[in-house]
């Protein structure tokens, strides 16, 4: 049996110290990762949530390929605004009412896995109707100004003309809407009476939006949106890419970037 020399003992000690340092370094890395994930989760729950625009229902204000930040604090918090929808909140906490004209993200009333983004048109107790394409709130037509028609190109490359209107809600909120067709299916509706604790939502692209005008059962629409389903308020377009952007073609991340929409505030 070979006896250990002083040098062997020194080497063993150094090796043990190195292993301890490696374990400590690995532990610090894990702690840093967990801390970063915790901060990200807290921010997503209480501050901002990212969201992307999948359809053209909110044109002209929001485009397919827009990536938004949705603020969580404006209306308080509910199951819908927390990841995985834990059943710890029955309705909302720190609740604040939505305002007419706000652009909000919400969970579909019949499919809480699906997020929608629309504009708030009707508040609880309101009577909403559409007559000849013009919104009527509590018997009063929403003032609108005809703008010059616009030639637009959709995501399939089709170019067409659309009428544009500038609407002004009773609280003074002004925004632009598209109206493609003179007699679209929901250009004339019955009166909708918004129940307590619910809101009436519409897309700005009026003839290409499945919203509160459509019955959730009979027409596969949205219907009234309960306040518990509100996720947050759309605040800012952080980034935006057009249809040329491809994940597997990194150069298109720059050539397809809509530079004029970077950090673009949402009206």
Question: For the regions a protein language model found, what residue spans apply to each?
Answer:
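Soluble "head" domains of membrane/secretory-pathway proteins
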Residues: 2-27, 46-47, 51-52, 60-267
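Acidic/histidine-enriched ion/cofactor-binding microenvironments in catalytic or ligand-binding pockets
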Residues: 56
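Hydrophobic membrane-insertion alpha-helices, especially the h-region
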Residues: 31-48
């Amino acid at each position: 049996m070979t006896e250990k020399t002083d040098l062997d003992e020194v080497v063993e000690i150094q090796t043990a110290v190195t292993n301890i340092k490696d374990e400590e370094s690995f532990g610090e890395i894990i702690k840093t990762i967990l801390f970063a994930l915790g901060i990200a989760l807290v921010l997503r729950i209480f501050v901002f949530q990212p969201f992307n625009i999948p359809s053209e229902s909110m044109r002209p204000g929001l485009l397919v390929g827009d990536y938004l930040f949705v603020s969580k604090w404006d209306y308080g918090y509910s199951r819908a605004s927390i990841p995985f929808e834990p059943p710890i909140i029955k309705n909302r906490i720190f609740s604040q009412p939505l305002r007419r004209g706000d652009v909000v993200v919400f969970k579909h009333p019949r499919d809480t896995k699906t997020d929608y983004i629309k504009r708030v048109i009707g508040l609880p107790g309101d009577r909403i109707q559409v007559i000849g394409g013009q919104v009527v709130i509590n018997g009063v037509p929403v003032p609108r100004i005809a703008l010059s028609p616009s030639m637009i190109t959709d995501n399939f490359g089709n170019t067409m003309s659309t009428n544009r209107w500038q609407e002004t809600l009773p609280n003074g909120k002004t925004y632009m809407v598209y109206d493609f067709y003179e007699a679209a299916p929901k250009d004339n509706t019955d009166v909708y009476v918004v129940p307590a604790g619910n809101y009436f939502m519409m897309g700005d692209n009026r003839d290409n939006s499945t919203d509160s005008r459509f019955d959730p059962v009979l027409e596969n629409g949205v219907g009234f949106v309960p306040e518990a389903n509100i996720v947050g308020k759309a605040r800012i377009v952080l980034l935006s890419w057009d249809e040329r952007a491809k994940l597997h073609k990194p150069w298109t991340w720059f050539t397809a970037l809509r530079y004029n929409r970077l950090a673009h505030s949402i009206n």
